[in-house]
């Protein structure tokens, strides 16, 4: 619900801005939860191998990212060579790693600026 509200009304934004909104909104959500709760969430996933094996394809955030990347592909601004699905999976794998690092550091640094630095590099996936 949080992500749906954060992304509402931004479907017409250009794909790079949509992707940044998805990632920054998710970072704000994760930070608001706090590192301890996020650590418990990941521990639960690790303790439930069936749950930890893959992303739920019906998850709103994943669908929003796929829609954004499909739009970028249709506009010819997504770099060729990788599928939209692989690219979305890459972003989630990377972001999960950033969140895990944040948890390992017990939330000692703000998550959003770290992600913003990474996104500046990732913008190169768009040919704009």
Question: What are the residue ranges of the model-derived segments?
Answer:
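Amphipathic alpha-helical packing segments from all-alpha helical-bundle domains
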Residues: 28-33, 49-75, 85-89, 93
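Phosphate/oxyanion-binding loops and surfaces in catalytic or ligand/nucleic-acid-binding neighborhoods
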Residues: 25-33, 94-101, 125-128
């Amino acid at each position: 619900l949080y992500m749906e509200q954060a992304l509402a009304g931004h479907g017409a934004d250009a794909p790079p801005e949509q992707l940044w909104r998805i990632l920054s909104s998710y970072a704000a959500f994760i930070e608001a939860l706090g590192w301890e709760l996020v650590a418990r969430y990941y521990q639960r996933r690790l303790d439930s191998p069936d749950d930890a094996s893959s992303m739920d394809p019906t998850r709103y955030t994943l669908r929003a990212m796929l829609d954004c990347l499909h739009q970028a592909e249709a506009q010819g601004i997504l770099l060729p060579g990788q599928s939209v699905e692989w690219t979305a999976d890459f972003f989630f794998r990377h972001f999960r790693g950033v969140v895990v690092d944040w948890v390992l550091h017990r939330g000692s640094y703000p998550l959003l600026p770290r992600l913003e630095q990474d996104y500046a590099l990732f913008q190169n996936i768009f040919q704009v």
